[in-house]
């Protein structure tokens, strides 16, 4: 897209592909962001987000005034607001802009991006987001992007479990699961989960496009936010329990399509 890019990660090999395509490797967060016009982060867990933004030599301390900060990790809406407030105090506009679409969307530049923060800052960041995503929406004040991602993950939880249950039922009823998937994919039951993860469930292909352990983190955040609002989410709660049971069996590094394992007869 023509933008000069500097990258930093804890493990240099994680950035190797980006460096091979022209990005410049930096040895610290401070070195990476010191001259940046826009800083983009995508890490694993809320504690990782806190570390890269708030620690000594971190982003808020090291980024130049005016640089746009965009955290694209799925994390707590409360943390997104904290980053926004701390960054604003140093003259750094900040957006929470989590994504959906998995590894396929990332590689193809077709991610869904949902952003919270000040709308004029979102407009300034939009050309960069357009290099990564296809469905890019401004959702409102700081934290709104993360709240939208919570809604996204709630919907995915039910959809993924629904596909696994449908295929498990088809098998138990003596149907050809592949033929069943083909038939129901042409009707109103169709979903991204059905089209993309349904075939993987049939093949028992559990290579991660999105890790179970990270989905557990997302669902836990969503349930926490719901509980803060005295909102019951029974489907999310049940699916979270299924995934936690899989993680307890050592399967946290498998892809979310491995939920079909929860329906295997022992």
Language model regions located:
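NAD(P)+-binding Rossmann beta1-loop-alpha1 motif at the extreme N-terminus of oxidoreductases
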Residues: 1-41, 67, 72-73, 103
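Residues in the short beta-alpha loop(s) of Rossmann-like NAD(P)-binding domains
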Residues: 10-11, 45, 118
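A short, aliphatic-rich alpha-helical micro-motif
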Residues: 30-34, 60-63, 129
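Glycine/threonine-rich flexible loop motifs
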Residues: 43-56
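ADP-ribose/adenylate-binding Rossmann-like module
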Residues: 60-80
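Rossmann-fold dinucleotide-binding core
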Residues: 75-157
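Active-site-proximal catalytic alpha-helix in oxidoreductases
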Residues: 109-116, 137, 141-173, 182-196, ...
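Interdomain hinge/lid region at the active-site interface
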Residues: 146, 190-255, 265
């Amino acid at each position: 897209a023509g933008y000069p890019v500097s990258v930093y990660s804890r493990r240099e090999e994680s950035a190797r592909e980006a460096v091979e395509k022209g990005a410049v490797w930096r040895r610290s967060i401070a070195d990476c962001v010191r001259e940046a016009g826009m800083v983009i982060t995508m890490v694993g867990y809320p504690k990782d987000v806190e570390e890269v933004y708030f620690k000594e030599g971190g982003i808020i301390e090291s980024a130049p005034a005016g640089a746009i900060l965009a955290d694209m990790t799925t994390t707590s809406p409360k943390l997104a607001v904290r980053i926004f407030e701390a960054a604003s105090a140093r003259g750094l506009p900040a957006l929470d802009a989590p994504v959906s679409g998995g590894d396929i969307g990332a590689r193809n530049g077709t991610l869904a991006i949902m952003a919270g923060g000040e709308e004029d800052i979102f407009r300034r960041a939009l050309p960069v987001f357009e290099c990564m995503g296809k469905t890019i929406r401004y959702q409102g004040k700081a934290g709104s992007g993360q709240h939208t991602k919570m809604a996204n993950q709630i919907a995915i939880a039910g959809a993924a479990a629904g596909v696994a249950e449908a295929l498990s039922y088809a098998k138990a009823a003596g149907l050809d699961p592949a033929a069943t998937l083909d038939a129901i994919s042409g009707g109103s039951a169709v979903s991204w989960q059905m089209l993309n993860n349904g075939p993987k469930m049939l093949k028992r292909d559990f290579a991660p496009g999105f890790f179970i352990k990270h989905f557990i983190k997302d669902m836990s955040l969503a349930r926490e936010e719901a509980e803060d609002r005295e909102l019951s989410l029974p489907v999310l709660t049940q699916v979270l329990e299924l995934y936690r049971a899989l993680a307890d069996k050592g399967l946290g590094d498998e892809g979310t399509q491995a939920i079909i394992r929860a329906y295997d007869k022992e």
